Curated annotation (Swiss-Prot):
Taxonomy, superkingdom: Bacteria
Endpoints of the signal sequence: none
An MF annotation (GO) of this entry: zinc ion binding
Protein name per UniProt: Dihydroorotase
UniProt gene name: pyrC
Binding site for substrate: H15, L16, R17, N41, H135, L218, H250, A262
Entry keywords, A to Z: Hydrolase, Metal-binding, Pyrimidine biosynthesis, Zinc
Required cofactor(s): Zn(2+)
Amino acid sequence: MTQLTITRPDDWHVHLRDGEVLKDTVRDISRYNGRALIMPNTIPPVTDTEMALAYRERIMAEQPSEQFQPLMALYLTDNTTPDEIRKAKESGAVVAAKLYPAGATTNSDSGVTSAQKIYHVLEAMQEVGMLLLVHGEVTAHDVDIFDREKEFLDTVLAPIVNDFPNLKIVLEHITTADAATFVKNANENVAATITAHHLLYNRNHMLVGGIKPHFYCLPILKRNTHQLALIEAATSGSKKFFLGTDSAPHAKGAKESACGCAGSYTAHAAVELYAEVFDLEGKIENLEAFASHNGPDFYGMPRNADTITLVKEEWNVAETMPFGSDIVVPIRGGETIAWAVK
């Protein structure tokens, strides 16, 4: 197959940052997505409804494509209240709340120190029908960075799923076979997003032949056996897995340093990169469900009414892209991608 028309996709996990860079990140994410769920770990984090609505206004001020709708999320802290959850739900603009274990990833220092501290908040979320988004890693110093997702599943997420069976939960950017199996075996209220870079790459790509800082992200790339399990899950047609890029830009200098930031930028070509994976697996016919159907179905939203067309046509990716007054190195920068949006 050399051409494929699919329902317009959505991105259910993306970082746009804030300030002068919004003009560039909004341009890329709105190019063909109908909706994008905007992560709240900005500086300062989006911890209440007023902040979420103000952030949404700043995004919309960049005049994204007419079809584009940003969806907002709250950043959960130990001090989040049930009343704030109800207020967010009533706003109509905030569709989820995000659990960042404190210190697990970029700008997460204000996150939740213990899941038990927000159980009353999770109860309110279950009651009003607000989704819980989860960065699934523990932060204990004695847990190896490659094992943090598995440990989180066992010690944090499994109890939450058990204690809140009617709470819809999205395990974000899964990176292990363990996570894929957990989601498959969990009740129908548990789903997961999978990034393009975790499907395309494993830790060898990041570490062999020299450190490749633009592959460094959190959760970190795992061994190839986990990569293969993610590919199987994403391309399987299962309604439990859907597109969430976790596109997370940092300026080139912030990545290429002695203490580089975590995050890979894929918003410039997300659906094209996913198409490569599905095509290589001989499952290109399942791309539409993963990219365009499963996400809105799980969130209880209508699917987009229009379409985009992909063609199997190689194109060159710019080595760098504008990022406010700086530049960002995108995934595949200076290389080619096999599929293009027509």
